[in-house]
Design a protein with these regions (language model features):
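Beta1/beta-strand and adjacent pyrophosphate-binding region of the FAD-binding site
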Residues: 4-18
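Conserved N-terminal/central alpha/beta ligand/cofactor-binding core
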Residues: 6-7, 24-128, 155-172, 179-185, ...
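Core beta-strand elements of the Rossmann-like FAD/NAD(P) dinucleotide-binding domain
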Residues: 8, 142-151
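Conserved beta-strand-loop-beta-strand element in the redox core of flavoprotein oxidoreductases
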Residues: 130-146
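Glycine-/small-residue-rich beta->alpha transition segments that form the dinucleotide
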Residues: 151, 156-160, 316, 329
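Flexible, glycine/charged-enriched surface loops at secondary-structure junctions
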Residues: 198, 265-272, 331-339
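Long, low-complexity segments enriched in small/aliphatic residues
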Residues: 217-301
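A glycine-rich dinucleotide-binding beta-alpha-beta segment and adjacent secondary-structure elements
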Residues: 308-339
Length: 339
């Protein structure tokens, strides 16, 4: 590190959604901020699905926006398709959702952080906190560099002792292809704090050219799209279509027969999963009476050849995933992206 920032008011650990909002919030309050991230280029990177908002989450994005946050603006500037969910119900449960270009979203947020005065971005891994008289006064990086500050905000997300499960295979990582953060959890536990583990899943990414699009149904956004941010004035986003398909009995049988190979059912994973995003194996098990489940094929960026399989979040072995998806009409010859 060429220069260690000084006179920092607020130091934020982690450059995901929460870390970005915390850093910018401190800046709006006139504080000098420092964002420590393991990879400067990954600030604002969307780990999972290429979307902002949705049921429950959409309301949160709006609330963040009212408080001056950047997420709504970033979504409005990178959106490929906008839709209000639950429109058939009362307005209190209407939920805004945007399909976004992951690359444009990341670039927008990265530029916002790097071009804001009084914010310093430091590339490094925080392994412990510095304490003085039971008060946090700074952090220590893995390379032993110390950064002093008035306050520390931890927004490490899935990276704290991150562990990826693919069937019986376990990979230590924050997200696929990126190392997890190790050492900080152990330090916090040594202070008497209790650690727990949450579980989230992600579906395989499909190669667009291996899909038979003629067997899918086009799903467009709203004809009169609504922006997330009240600060967005001019708003004429594209309406890039997604596509829907449905699982079937054969797909369900393939998954059901391999449930014991899913960490959720083998006992390897005991964490609580997100309520509004159950895994495909959980849906097959809990709703055995259902003959089909909807899957949404979503582009990860404009003209993307990498397709996100919304509705097929899973931790099953890769071969089982591929076999189950190839049982679905339109995906008979599907191939996975391996990056």
């Amino acid at each position: 590190m060429k220069h260690v920032p000084e006179n920092i008011d607020v130091l934020v650990v982690g450059g995901g959604h929460a870390g970005i909002e915390a850093t910018l919030a401190a800046n709006r309050m006139g504080m000098k901020g420092c964002l420590v991230t393991m990879d400067k280029k990954a600030v604002g990177r969307m780990s999972c699905n290429p979307a902002i908002g949705g049921i429950a989450k959409g309301q949160m994005v709006r609330e963040i926006d009212v408080l001056g946050g950047v997420m709504g603006l970033a979504a409005d500037n990178s959106g490929l398709q906008f839709k209000i969910l639950n429109r058939s119900k009362g307005k209190s449960v209407w939920s805004p959702r945007a399909q976004v270009d992951k690359r444009v979203y990341e670039k927008y947020v990265n530029n916002r952080i790097n071009n804001t005065k009084e914010i310093t971005v430091v590339e490094g891994e925080v392994v412990r906190l510095l304490l003085r008289n039971f008060k946090v006064v700074g952090v220590v990086l893995r390379n032993n560099v110390r950064i002093y500050t008035q306050a520390v905000v931890l927004t490490c997300g899935t990276f704290l002792n991150g562990l990826i499960h693919i069937g019986e295979r376990k990979i230590r990582a924050g997200r696929m292809g990126e190392p997890g953060a190790e050492g900080l959890t152990e330090f916090l536990v040594s202070l008497g704090l209790v650690s727990g583990r949450l579980k989230t899943g992600t579906p395989p990414r499909l190669i667009a050219d291996s899909i038979d699009w003629t067997k899918t149904t086009v799903a467009c956004g709203d004809k009169k799209p609504t922006p997330f941010s009240y600060r967005t004035m001019a708003f004429s986003p594209p309406d890039v279509p997604c596509h829907t398909i449905k699982t079937n009995a054969l797909c369900h049988d393939i998954i059901y027969n391999d449930l014991d190979r899913s960490p959720m059912f083998s006992g390897d994973v005991s964490g609580v999963g997100p309520r509004y995003c159950p895994s495909i194996e959980d849906k097959i098990y809990r709703f055995a009476h259902r003959e089909e489940h909807a899957l949404f094929l979503e582009p990860e960026w404009f003209n993307s050849k990498q397709i996100y399989t919304n509705g097929f979040s899973t931790s099953l072995p890769e071969k089982t995933q591929l076999k189950a998806l190839r049982a679905v009409a339109g995906l008979e010859n599907v191939e996975f992206h391996n990056n």
